[in-house]
Amino acid sequence: MLGAVMNIGEKLYASDRKDWRRWLEANFNREKEIWLIYPSKESGKPRIPYNDAVEEALCFGWIDSNVRHLDEYSSAQRFSSRKP
């Protein structure tokens, strides 16, 4: 279906590495996935660098995967726990 809005589940905006790590510490063993929001440069909002997000996720056994465009000012990337 062209033009359909995709439901991507629970989203999180973390403005920096510390916010992302705090969320992971509290939720890595309770949640199966989270879609981390990346604001565009044009939005003017602070954003966690991709490499920082991946490094923190790996510390908790999580990996990155799909990216989805949300709107003209943001996208979201799926992070989830690795399969054992």
Per-region residue spans from a language model:
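Charge-dense, helix-prone N-terminal extensions
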Residues: 1-84
